[in-house]
Amino acid sequence: MKEKHSLKYVILVTFVATLGGLLFGYDTAVISGTTGALKSFFIDPLMTNAEAAVSVVAEYRITIGLCAALVGVLLSYFLYKMYSRTKATILSSALFIVGGIILYTQFFNQSDVLDVSMANSIRGFVISSALVGCIVGGAIGGAISTSIGRKNGLILAAILFSVSAAGSGYPDGMNVFGVEMVTSLIIYRIIGGVGVGLASMLAPMYIAEMAPAKYRGTLVSLNQFAIILGMNIVYFVNYYIAGLGDSSWLDTIGWRYMFLSELIPAFLFFVMLFFVPETPRYLVLKDRAEKAETVLNKLVGKTEASHELKEIKNSLTQKDAPWLSYGIGVIVIGILISFFQQAVGINVVLYYAPEIFRNMGASTDTSLLQTIIVGIVNLTFTCVAIFTV
């Protein structure tokens, strides 16, 4: 009876943490329903407003430059972690030189006129800008989890999701940056991306540190299920919102509701996090062993709590060893697997599915319905992977 009680508690805290994964998927896919509005509401009016167009192009270049510099700094940091100072300096210098050349030739050495090519480039960056935030969120996730904790890190992610949803829905009314409206939208999408990056790292970490060993693999895999489920939910939400009016309404008002709909799961995630504890591992790390044992009592029962606490303490014993000395090859293989997973082009489908179907002749409603089918297929084979691997 006690084990059943503990399992129910484990499932409860896992459910709360997987809301972070759900928001990951929700935030990633919500943009797919707004691609048409991004052109008609944000880009097309600039074609007849030369002054605003010049300002948008300038802000776009500055934003691209800042994002590229930030990513370059993060990559350089990891290069210095992995290699000697001399080798890391050479690689970092090469990285910035090549990156600078690409930026100059592709973005800065172009006309200030907002032509069709530049307009498409800006719209494409708006759609994918959250990925910049993902890089930042993923890079700082480790430091966040160590400094303020896994739970507080997830609370921060929930706040970022909420700010992004509200700001993306009203980039004009919440434009506190003093920039053009489309640039304000980009900034809020990047903020949401930081939340995605944090959640993608901290949610599975939280689950892994809370789950008993015999359930850990299954429960952690539920986070991936939640990500795909979040995508499917927002596909249905976008389809429902699109049905509330015609295409003109969708391009002027409806797209706002799509972004704002994320506030509901984000607020739910934020509130529920206050009803779950910090992980025992983090509590031990901060010399709060008694509190850690209290949490373990709820997770595994009193008979196992002392043993689990001892194992956690042993695992945190400091050992002097070079960074990644346990095998850089394993890390490289893991990174390459993730890289090639993205390189197949799945994000193009996730972001542009409705537009792809519209260009094939489907109406707005039909294209969103077809996107739901894509999401269901994605969810189905995610379940196959979870329960067969």
Predicted features and spans:
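Alpha-helical transmembrane bundle of multi-pass membrane proteins
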Residues: 1-290, 295, 314-389
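Conserved H-loop
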Residues: 302-306, 363
